[in-house]
Structure formats: structure tokens, C-alpha cells
A protein has these predicted regions:
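Sec-dependent signal peptide recognition
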Residues: 4-9
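Bacterial Sec-dependent signal peptides at the C-terminal "C-region" and cleavage site
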Residues: 13-20
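Hydrophobic N-terminal alpha-helices or hydrophobic patches in metabolic proteins across all domains
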Residues: 21-144
Length: 144
């Protein structure tokens, strides 16, 4: 019973903390995007092997509101705030341990497929094995 109370209290504190964060909201062709990490900030976490990591963000990073990815979570997006291109690129990210499909990452504001690929890879260590490919997609494919 004590563990359950502690768990509920922890969830409540996480909810309060998360709701106090001031995320930037932008829109792409009418689709709302929440920017969790702006260009120039530092993103951090713990990888699947339990190792802490941190990464300076060279582009905005967030997610599309109300668009779920294949992993049933909001679809992640890297957004180049200085870019003028309307092209949409989709990265296939692999699980680094199993090398199987993990999730998609959308790249916005990049003019070429190579720019989008480099915009993704710059956020990962050299030799990153989580990159599974990139393709240009249509707005219709994105918004369905």
C-alpha cells in the first residue's frame, strides 16, 4: 500500500512539473507542433542501455500534436527554424540494440534529402546505428 501511495505521489509531481514547463507552439500548414527543445538548448536523457546522455540541439525538436506515430506516441519532428523549404522528410529510426524499427522522425525546413539527413545525424554520435533510412513524403502522408 505504501508503494502505491508513493507511486501516485510521484506521478502527481511529474504531472505538476510537466504542466509548468513553457513549451513553444508553432504551426506547420495548420498542424500544431509543440517544441520541447529549441535550437541552442541541451536535450538530455538515459539511453536503452542505462547510460546518461546530453546533446546540444542544432534545430528545434518536438512533436506534432494529435498525430501519432507508429509507436502510438506523438510524431517527433526536427524543425529548421531558418529553413524556407516546404519539403517533408521522414527518417526511419532503428532500435540501436535490436536494429529493428523504432519510430519515425519528421524533418521540416530542410531543402534537400541530404540536408535533412545531416540535420538528424548531427544530434547523434559518430557511427550512430539508429539511422534506418530517409524518404521524402507528401503532406497528405504526414497528416493521415
Amino acid at each position: 500500500m505504501q508503494v502505491k501511495r508513493l507511486f501516485v505521489a510521484l506521478l502527481f509531481l511529474l504531472f505538476v512539473f510537466y504542466s509548468c514547463l513553457d513549451f513553444t507552439e508553432v504551426s506547420y500548414r495548420g498542424l500544431p507542433i509543440t517544441i520541447e527543445y529549441e535550437k541552442g538548448t541541451v536535450r538530455s536523457g538515459i539511453d536503452k542501455e542505462g547510460n546518461p546522455w546530453q546533446q546540444e540541439m542544432f534545430y528545434h525538436y518536438g512533436y506534432f500534436n494529435n498525430i501519432l506515430g507508429e509507436d502510438c506516441e506523438e510524431l517527433d519532428v526536427y524543425y529548421n527554424p531558418d529553413g524556407k523549404s516546404d519539403k517533408i522528410f521522414r527518417i526511419t529510426q532503428l532500435d540501436v540494440l535490436t536494429k529493428e524499427f523504432d519510430e519515425y522522425k519528421i524533418m521540416l525546413g530542410f531543402s534537400t534529402i541530404e540536408d535533412a539527413k545531416q540535420g538528424y545525424l548531427v544530434h547523434y554520435p559518430d557511427g550512430w546505428v539508429g539511422f534506418g533510412g530517409i524518404e521524402e513524403i507528401s503532406f497528405k502522408d504526414l497528416s493521415k
